């Protein structure tokens, strides 16, 4: 059990029959009445975000999440196959389970697979990935307005906005948390 006064961003807790990750929290001490903790939580099974208020000092159960390094192998229809780097066991996860992660997954990529009580609840990607541009419009010479962008499609099928100087065949470094262009690889 952990006190809500000890909340930190990224902490995982078990509340209301769900596994939740603390995204944001705020200790509130009103002039009248008792203190409380206002929190924003993400359900690790469904991805839903919920705001919840706890009384100061209230105890909640901390969820022990196991992270295992795994390698993404391939897509098998709608399923995606991962291999444990230590035991070489393979697991299959359905495509709808991975959601946004599919935009960045490519063969042989190392990821962290998160599980709670032997149930897989999520896949954590590296902070950045390098992906090759497969389709984009050619940059027009002299079109160098500050901050101008165009759309580009990378090898996974994901489309993002990139600077005008990016061409087909370039390798891009992409931020996996928001899908934005960082630099050329």
UniProtKB/Swiss-Prot annotation:
GO terms for cellular component: cytoplasm. The gene is efp. It comes from Staphylococcus epidermidis (strain ATCC 12228 / FDA PCI 1200). PROSITE patterns: EFP (PS01275). It is found in: Cytoplasm. Its main location: cytoplasm. Involved in peptide bond synthesis. Stimulates efficient translation and peptide-bond synthesis on native or reconstituted 70S ribosomes in vitro. Probably functions indirectly by altering the affinity of the ribosome for aminoacyl-tRNA, thus increasing their reactivity as acceptors for peptidyl transferase. Belongs to the elongation factor P family. Pathway: Protein biosynthesis; polypeptide chain elongation. This is Elongation factor P. InterPro entries: Elong-fact-P_C, NA-bd_OB-fold, Rib_uL2_dom2, Transl_elong_fac_P/YeiP, Transl_elong_KOW-like, Transl_elong_P/YeiP_cen, Transl_elong_P/YeiP_CS, Transl_elongation_fac_P. SUPFAM superfamilies: Nucleic acid-binding proteins (SSF50249), Translation proteins SH3-like domain (SSF50104). Keywords: Cytoplasm, Elongation factor, Protein biosynthesis. GO terms for biological process: peptide biosynthetic process. GO terms for molecular function: translation elongation factor activity.
